[in-house]
């Protein structure tokens, strides 16, 4: 169960981090 939860967390966080990084680079 814990492993599945971490999998889910990574699936959500990776695109969020990528989008944030892209947004920051665009602002700079």
Curated annotation (Swiss-Prot):
The protein's name in its UniProt record: Uncharacterized 3.4 kDa protein in ndd-denB intergenic region
Source organism: Enterobacteria phage T4 (Bacteriophage T4)
Gene for this chain: y16P
């Amino acid at each position: 169960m814990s492993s599945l939860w971490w999998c889910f967390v990574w699936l959500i966080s990776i695109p969020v981090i990528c989008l944030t990084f892209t947004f920051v680079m665009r602002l700079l």
